């Protein structure tokens, strides 16, 4: 072979090798072919654009060196200023890095977003991507994956973030959740409620309540119909928001109704739903419809303990005895100047401050009718958990408050008055009591632009920056091609790869801003967890899914580290599933802090819960912790709230499949926290939770449909919850009464029939004989009867007759009044 030809072939091989190291980058077009990628280094040019030019899709810089993969309106005033109007994001709360991140339509047909280290941050939901040929950005703003016949296999319209676009269906499975500037999900949800009514919901761990339609009016007065279970809505091209729950064909109509206007329906971080219309001449946006015309009616606007009032503009203030937690972010609300706890509570050192024409909506411990002001006061002051009470003059209605959320003032004609409980040592001035006064001459404006701001460090670059830009990898390829012989090229290639395969711990530790953004959920190296657990020295427990060890992280957080066993998923799928679980946050669910996926190691890092499992306390012989009635009822309620959140509220609904006392942990205040949720997916024993067939749960807690091989739904958790209720009441493990699965089911059927017969009568003396002999008296027999009745309904053979966990929560709350 002639030398020039050999040199040319050698150069071509070298270039091919280097180019093969990186995914194919797609240029600006509406189609992403199978096997192609959009790469973050070329984010300004490597985009998809709808055929009519209205929408673009690609990497959007949310912070320095931090990107989301998003869809945006192409021609707007904001886009020209590089502040694009985002209508959908794959990873709104988990940005990827500015180097080596890519969105790839893989050869198997799935679309995956990977971070700089190759970790899958997001992937398209679905199980069947057979025959996929391309991804396409449609003129509607819908990003779709299509097969060879042009059929849609997946679409972004099915998983909206904070915006609905015209022609996009609003269904029972879709919801809007705003993203704050700190890239965390907001506290508001727009979705169909369980009454099939399109609703705005304020949702935080302590409370979840609807504020639109107006909860103080009945639905019919608001033009809504709760008797249509269709749950279907849509924003039309003309600016009409129609929904199946709107009575008599009503609809919400834009002020500029008509065709030819570009629109978007967005749930903003302040909790208001707004319809925006674009001005074609300059690309600016204007509000053409708003759900909440009075901002103070938005629940939680001023955060916990805060009060919204008009002076005359909407303003947030703290009540007497409270101070602003973060002046730049009112969603954090107010904190008590003097914090009182139940272990040091002395009602003689407490007093009440009257806040006229004021209310904290919801969070009532109970509702009492026709009682005196003194009686209402005595009820609250005798309860260390009561923060204050609302009292209505004339009707004698009394509402003791467990929490102080959604505070607001009303016109002077309103009869609602809050009596705030404060230590006697806290001084109070009448000038500090918030009031709505349209004649106030010095209004303190509610700065909506600062409502959700959180100062964050910019993301630092993981590489040392020099003259290289987004084409740095091609630069190395050409240098190697022209200056390095074949033998030295091989050595350089190995160095090139290994240099960048840094250990995860080294990469994370070197990036303070990046680590800060992902500190709520991050990846740990195996070496970090070996150190944290002191080589897995202290075992906390073990089960079918793995062994749990106690550990302490470098930031002194105490954690539980679980070594998962029998994980057969690939690394990318495991990390993608965990990215969903890591976003789940509820006060009755154990918080997942992170994971390790290194080689064959699969570990979960979660918060350490001090008092261990309910099983240890409930069933251990000679235990030194005895649960009183109040504690047991609170555990039943807390577990119900946690399961209701998994089934109905979190962004991706989760079936636990193994609810039992071992998976219910108790913190220092004996508040229950459910653990091991989401492990059905992680352990890959049956695939999707919509079609689980191999996970069998634990003997004594498994629902009949497991045995019948029926499709598994959330009702399996309801059944297991019913068994847990029986064990809470009796203090005895059901499975120990008999042996074998069939015998347990047979015994439970007899027990359910016996309890059902007892519940038909008015007699209550039999309840004492059924309850745990170790139970400290007194017992609230109304609550006991409610728990027994709920357990019986949860243990129905026919799963369609079992209640939902949301219904269970409401049942228990009504008994708690």
Swiss-Prot record:
GO terms for biological process: recognition of pollen; response to other organism. ATP binds at residues 540-548, 562. Glycans are attached at residues 83, 128, 228, 279, 329, 339, 452. Residues 342-424 form the PAN domain. Disulfide bonds join 296-308, 302-316, 376-398, 384-386. It comes from Zea mays (Maize). Its EC number is 2.7.11.1. Residues 29-158 form the Bulb-type lectin domain. This is Putative receptor protein kinase ZmPK1.
């Amino acid at each position: 072979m002639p030398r020039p030809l050999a040199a040319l072939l050698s150069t071509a091989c070298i270039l091919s090798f280097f180019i093969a190291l990186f995914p194919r980058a797609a240029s600006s077009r509406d189609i992403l072919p199978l096997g192609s990628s959009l790469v973050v280094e070329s984010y300004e040019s490597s985009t998809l654009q709808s055929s009519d030019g209205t929408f673009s899709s690609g990497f959007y810089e949310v912070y320095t060196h931090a990107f989301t993969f998003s869809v945006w309106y192409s021609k707007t005033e904001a886009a020209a200023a590089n502040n694009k109007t985002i209508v959908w994001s794959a990873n709104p709360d988990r940005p990827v890095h500015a180097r080596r991140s890519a969105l790839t339509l893989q050869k198997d047909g799935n679309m995956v977003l990977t971070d700089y280290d190759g970790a899958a941050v997001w992937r398209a939901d679905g199980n069947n991507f057979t025959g996929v040929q391309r991804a396409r950005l449609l003129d509607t703003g819908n990003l779709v994956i299509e097969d060879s016949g042009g059929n849609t296999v997946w679409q972004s319209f099915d998983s909206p973030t904070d915006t609905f676009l015209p022609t996009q269906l609003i269904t029972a499975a879709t919801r809007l959740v705003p993203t704050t500037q700190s890239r965390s999900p907001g506290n508001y949800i727009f979705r169909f409620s369980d009454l099939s009514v399109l609703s705005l919901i304020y949702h935080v761990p302590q409370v979840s309540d609807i504020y639109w339609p107006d909860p103080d009016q009945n639905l019919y007065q608001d033009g809504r119909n709760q008797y249509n279970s269709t749950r279907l809505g849509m924003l039309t091209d003309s600016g009409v928001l129609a929904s199946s729950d709107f009575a008599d064909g009503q609809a919400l109509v834009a002020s500029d109704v008509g065709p030819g206007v570009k629109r978007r329906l967005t749930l903003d971080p302040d909790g208001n739903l707004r319809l925006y219309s674009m001005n074609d001449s300059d690309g600016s946006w204007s509000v053409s419809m708003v759900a909440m015309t009075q901002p103070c009616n938005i629940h939680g606007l001023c955060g916990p303990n805060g009060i919204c009032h008009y002076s005359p503009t909407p303003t947030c203030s703290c009540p007497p005895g409270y101070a602003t937690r973060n002046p730049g972010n009112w969603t954090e609300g107010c904190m008590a100047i003097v914090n009182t706890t139940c272990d040091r509570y002395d009602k003689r050192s407490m007093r009440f401050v009257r806040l006229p024409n004021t209310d904290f909506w919801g969070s009532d411990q109970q509702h009492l009718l026709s009682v005196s002001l003194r009686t209402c006061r005595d009820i609250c002051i005798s309860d260390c958990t009561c923060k204050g009470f609302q009292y209505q003059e004339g009707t004698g209605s009394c509402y003791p408050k467990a929490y102080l959320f959604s505070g607001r003032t009303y016109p002077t004609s309103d009869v609602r008055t809050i009596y705030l409980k404060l230590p006697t040592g806290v001084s109070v001035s009448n000038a500090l009591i918030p009031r709505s006064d349209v004649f106030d001459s010095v209004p303190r404006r509610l700065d909506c632009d600062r409502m959700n701001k959180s100062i964050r460090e910019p993301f630092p670059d993981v590489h040392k920056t020099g003259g290289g830009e987004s084409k740095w990898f091609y630069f190395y390829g050409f240098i190697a091609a022209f200056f390095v012989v074949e033998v030295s090229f091989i050595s350089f290639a190995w160095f090139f790869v290994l240099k960048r395969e840094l250990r995860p711990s080294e990469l994370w530790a070197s990036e303070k801003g990046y680590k800060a953004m992902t500190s709520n959920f991050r990846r740990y190296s195996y070496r970090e967890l070996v150190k944290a657990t002191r080589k897995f020295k202290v075992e906390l427990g073990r089960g079918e899914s793995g062994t749990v060890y106690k550990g302490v992280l470098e930031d002194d957080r105490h954690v539980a580290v679980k070594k998962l066993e029998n994980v057969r998923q690939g690394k990318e799928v495991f990390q993608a599933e965990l990215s969903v679980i890591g976003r789940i946050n509820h006060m009755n669910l154990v918080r997942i802090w992170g994971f390790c996926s290194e080689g064959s190691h699969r570990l979960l890092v979660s918060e350490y819960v001090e008092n261990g499992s309910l099983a240890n306390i409930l069933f251990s012989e000679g235990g030194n912790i005895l649960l009183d009635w109040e504690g047991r009822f609170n555990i039943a309620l807390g577990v119900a709230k946690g399961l209701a959140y998994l089934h109905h509220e979190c962004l991706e609904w989760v079936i636990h499949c193994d609810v039992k006392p071992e998976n219910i942990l108790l913190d220092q205040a004996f508040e229950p926290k459910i653990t091991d949720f989401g492990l059905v997916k992680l352990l890959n024993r049956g695939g999707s939770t919509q079609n689980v067939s191999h996970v069998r749960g634990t003997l004594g807690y498994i629902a009949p449909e497991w045995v019948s091989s029926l499709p598994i739904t959330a009702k399996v958790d309801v059944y297991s919850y019913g068994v847990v209720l029986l064990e809470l009441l009796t203090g005895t493990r059901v499975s120990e009464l008999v042996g074998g699965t069939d015998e347990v089911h047979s015994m439970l059927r007899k027990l359910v029939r016996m309890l059902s017969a007892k519940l038909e009568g008015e007699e209550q003396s039999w309840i004492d004989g059924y309850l745990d002999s170790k139970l400290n008296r007194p017992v609230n027999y109304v609550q006991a009867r409610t728990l027994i009745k709920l357990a019986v309904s949860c243990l129905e053979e026919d799963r369609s007759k079992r209640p939902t966990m949301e219904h269970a929560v409401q049942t228990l709350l009504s008994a708690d009044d």
